[in-house]
Amino acid sequence: MESKRLDNAALAAGISPNYINAHGKPQSISAETKRRLLDAMHQRTATKVAVTPVPNVMVYTSGKKMPMVVEGSGEYSWLLTTEEGTQYKGHVTGGKAFNLPTKLPEGYHTLTLTQDDQRAHCRVIVAPKRCYEPQALLNKQKLWGACVQLYTLRSEKNWGIGDFGDLKAMLVDVAKRGGSFIGLNPIHALYPANPESASPYSPSSRRWLNVIYIDVNAVEDFHLSEEAQAWWQLPTTQQTLQQARDADWVDYSTVTALKMTALRMAWKGFAQRDDEQMAAFRQFVAEQGDSLFWQAAFDALHAQQVKEDEMRWGWPAWPEMYQNVDSPEVRQFCEEHRDDVDFYLWLQWLAYSQFAACWEISQGYEMPIGLYRDLAVGVAEGGAETWCDRELYCLKASVGAPPDILGPLGQNWGLPPMDPHIITARAYEPFIELLRANMQNCGALRIDHVMSMLRLWWIPYGETADQGAYVHYPVDDLLSILALESKRHRCMVIGEDLGTVPVEIVGKLRSSGVYSYKVLYFENDHEKTFRAPKAYPEQSMAVAATHDLPTLRGYWECGDLTLGKTLGLYPDEVVLRGLYQDRELAKQGLLDALHKYGCLPKRAGHKASLMSMTPTLNRGLQRYIADSNSALLGLQPEDWLDMAEPVNIPGTSYQYKNWRRKLSATLESMFADDGVNKLLKDLDRRRRAAAKKK
């Protein structure tokens, strides 16, 4: 009886009773996992909401019938107020359904039900069927752009890390060569007080920006500050700066120390202002409200905590009195350190303003997409977002991936999941706010691990990933809200749908107008016959690789496998041998396809095992995806420069310097290089030809 009750409770909470393992067989979830995941959820909080005649939120598709079932008995009067203030009225009997007016506009409306002195409210969300698509894509153009890890950019002026100044310059260079966008890694807020926690996919908050990307050279108060300029002229400053700039790997600690020193001095001058700039800053702070304030408070408090003890990596390691955002001690800290909090507010304003200026540049060059941002799948356990909202995040669990052949224990990403019951109890407000924050100043948003809108692999805290289970999310409602916000922001959506993709979400994503992600390396069958360029789906973005995969040279030379062996990533020699054999077959299949579809000169070799990477082969591989039917093409500067080293190796942390490897050339020299310019001209021409072949 007890086990039946547990199974029912787990099912009701959205916990799947089993999953399909790497061998294609159903595997049951243990009672202990169900128990611990139920314990991790805040279901009791979510269900505390009083039972009402209507749910707290309903989501509908525009133009379709909108039935509303009213629970209870007796007569109710209803009043529907649209976002614009238009009102509709009527009466309904409890236990029956009625249809909301079909002419309801898209948006967020409020339904109020009244009976005697009792009132119930329902948020009514009316959404379009599909996400926004730019006119260029509706006109069947084939667009291309650069996919960039911003921190990897080198330039003659930056401070040892790619910044918003570099992004601005690169947008101009890409636009002039026919490119339509620059795609970015997540630029979410990280940890100024813990700069070595550098993964863009383990952010402190997804609502705010990473202040390391501020271009200090573009900050007026840095140039106006005598103190800052005296510091700038010091030989030690210039020497440290040059070392950071020349390094092949981003030195986050040095770069952060340099930027924070300069910006602290600049802030002293800005804080004295009483002008339009100060008014704009204050207005930004007022408009962004509590969420921004607590981000700044977190960063200020974190900086103080790390000064006292550098092991205080995040709020779970702080003294208990500072672990709760509502504690009197936190309030007192904010009052006593008002200038510090204001400094971090200012940094967010600077980052926002500089990123907005990049967007303006892209629009000035009439780039159809301009910038595309990346939304990480979650936030880190000890960051600002979990500190501010303990109820929304389930800290007794983390997300990851189930076991597979390469990783028999699965993957644990160390990110606490959002509680689907709390998201619904709050009428989807956390999801809406997240989209709004990330759809600003861009023409596209890439959603990392888009399957998370349907389900996430939850792992009880402290366990390995093989002890996890899938937890379901309200996918239809979330996709509808995604379409509404996408349309409002004129921001198209790309869903990263690699790995295990459940059949039920594929159709939903396509019909919602979410663009798929097609990686050249994976577009083949069991015989290693590669998908023809013309067979790529139009509603997709084609790329050769991603930040988690080897570059073209790395792939062809099996550098990723060699490195994986050195780092001990594979369970045994048998697995590794199988991977090498698989790669050789894939390379031959790829080479055959390059010849078959005219991407290589006829004189080029036909036997992959005898061919090394050459400029001709590199160009041929990029031509293959340039010829594809995909509406979008993402190219990596690493491949323009024929680089071999990866920027990230999944499954490693301390074993490899992830998120640090820079490009091998500065932006200035890359765009002055004849080889790069000829390559981009060739690929741009082929994209235009691919559009005409339709």
From Swiss-Prot:
Gene Ontology MF terms: 4-alpha-glucanotransferase activity
Reaction(s) catalysed (UniProt annotation): Transfers a segment of a (1->4)-alpha-D-glucan to a new position in an acceptor, which may be glucose or a (1->4)-alpha-D-glucan
One GO CC term, this protein: cytosol
Enzyme Commission number(s) from the entry: 2.4.1.25
Alphabetically ordered keywords of this record: Carbohydrate metabolism, Cytoplasm, Glycosyltransferase, Transferase
Matches recorded under Pfam families: Glyco_hydro_77, MalQ_N
UniProt xrefs under Gene3D superfamilies: Glycosidases (3.20.20.80)
GO terms (BP aspect): glycogen biosynthetic process; glycogen catabolic process; maltose catabolic process
Primary subcellular site in the record, as a coarse category: cytoplasm
Compartments where found: Cytoplasm
Family, per entry: Belongs to the disproportionating enzyme family.
Descriptive protein name: 4-alpha-glucanotransferase
Species of the source: Escherichia coli (strain K12)
